[in-house]
């Protein structure tokens, strides 16, 4: 089973692959559903594909907006460009875009996006008959339904296994349109995440009088889903015939992407190694608790979710750790590493490391010097690079993190 990770920009793409993803999905500056996710220029996409292929890994490009007429302009040449740079596939949700892809870039594999709401085997078979090589199933499909679809249709199936959930059916939401008077449209890449807002109730005969719904003093989070987490169910996903496990999060941090990928990499590899002897290790789940997240749920995997799949207490996710630094270079000959600051830290404090191999251990911030060779007591400046003395083995791209207060 492929491990597929989000890549909101070049740094996230490289970190995802280095921490164990088999493939990444990303968007260009147009035609994707995360207009505010950073995204890639054409030149960056070409570089990303070359980098991934050098590592023996894959890149999928999202072209999954639900377009209006004006959105179609230039799409044919864009798809042809993706074919020319040898992207491994495009993700598409719209039949018209699918047609353009077949005409303009016939050698470019097409994966059907979850936005297409493929929730049954007849729909999946129809997409296959039209030329799709993979279908990303709707998030509303259960594990048993996944297995049944795979038995009936010989095609690659991709499913979301971790990350934020949309409150609407496979993302077909108009809340952003409503709250912005049509200026921000979710299905054209401009979601404002209105499902995370705080709401109160107004009775129509009493305009201007707002009533709480007995959750807290801020209102009610009636659309606020918990986050999906399927790390405890890797065997069931593989046995159901899932070809690719997808992690949500093109707008999440570098730290989030790396840590989540590392945990799922270990779980998937462990199942393939141990088979029937496989068991879920507590440190995998602990790692997922250390990233920004809401309480976890298995959503639709085993049954239609009830009220327990919603988070009623608050809309903001937990953020138990701060990402404070990234190792850029390791110099074993003199026991130093070059670290790029991501949050304030100081010499002498004990922090935690996460390496690209997925190893986790504490380390003391050693003697620091700045780029001018001057001693530094702390690292207060965003993205400043410092040399740190350490006896630990900290390879490039190791993450330094610190537990937040409380």
Question: PLM features: residue spans?
Answer:
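Gly/Gly-Pro- and Ser/Thr-rich, intrinsically disordered tail segments characteristic of DNA damage-repair
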Residues: 73, 107-108, 112-121
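Short beta-strand elements of ligand-binding domains
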Residues: 61-62, 92, 111-114
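Glycine-rich, positively charged N-terminal anion/phosphate-binding segment
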Residues: 34-51
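Alpha-helix capping/helix-boundary segments
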Residues: 96-97
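Surface-exposed amphipathic alpha-helical tracts and adjacent flexible/coil segments at the periphery
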Residues: 1-18, 23-30, 49, 55-65, ...
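Short glycine-biased active-site loop of nucleotidyltransferases that positions the nucleotide triphosphate
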Residues: 102
